[in-house]
Amino acid sequence: MTEDTLLSARGLTLSFGAIPALVEVDVDLWPGEMLAVVGESGSGKTTLLNVLSGRVAPQSGAVWYRDPAGRLHDVHAMPAPVLRSLHRSDWGFVHQDPKQNLRMAVTAGGNVGERLMAQGARHYGDIRNQALEWLRQVEIDADRIDDLPRTFSGGMLQRLQIARTLVTHPRLVFMDEPTGGLDVSVQARLLDLIRTLVARLSIAAVLVTHDIAVARLLAHRIAVMQRGRVVETGLTDQVLDDPQHPYTQLLVSSVLHA
C-alpha cells in the first residue's frame, strides 16, 4: 500500500464451489477518487465490492484501509463491532435496491437522522434540521420529511438512500449499481446528483456498474473485470478510448454498436 492511498487490496481470491469469483485481484483507491468496476454479469464486480467493504471475507489476500490519522487497518482482521462502527461513520454503502439500506417503517427524516444518531447526535432540532438540509440537497421536497419511504417513487427512494448515506460526510462510499432498474430520465438526474455531491464532499467511491456510459461520466479510473480477474485498469477516458485487452475492446465495441 503506497503512502497516500485510502484503500488497497492485494491478491484477493475467492471461489464459490468450483466457480472462481475473484482471482488475485489488486485494487488501489486514493482520497477523493471514484473508481468504477465494470464488466458483464458474473464477472465478479459485486463480489469485489463486498470483499473491499468487509462484508464478505476472501479466501486469500488482504484489504487495507487508512484512517484519518494515517493508521493502516486490515479490514478483514477488524473485530465485527469496529467494522460496524466504520460503516456508520467513515464509510457508506449505496445499494441498487434502496430498500436494503432504508427502514421502510421510519419516516424520510428519521432515516436520515438515524445515521447522525449512530454517531452520537442527540439534539432533536439539530438532527431534524440536518435531515431537512439533506432532503433539499437530494431534491426531495421538505414537506415529505415525515412521509414513509413506501410512498416514494423508485428514484426518490434512491435519493433518500443517498441522503442517509452522505449525511455523516463519509470518506469512502461503496456503490452497487445505484442507477440500476430506473428509467433513463431518472437515471440521468440521479447521476448528475451523485457526481455533484461526491465532488463537493471530496468523497472517495468504488462504483460497480455494467454501464460503461455511467463509468465514463462519474469515474476518474476504471477497472475492467472478466471471470473474476481485473484484465485492464487505468484512467477512465484512456481505457475506454484506447482499450488494450480484447475483452475491454469487446465491451467498448458493444456499446458503440448498440
Residue spans for each PLM region:
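The feature captures the beta-strand-to-loop junction immediately N-terminal to the Walker
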Residues: 38-40
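Helix-to-loop junction immediately C-terminal to a conserved catalytic motif
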Residues: 53
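ABC ATPase NBD Q-loop/coupling interface
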Residues: 62-85
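Conserved ABC ATPase "signature" region
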Residues: 126-143, 252-253
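Conserved ABC ATPase signature
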Residues: 148-152, 156
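ABC ATPase "signature
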Residues: 233-234
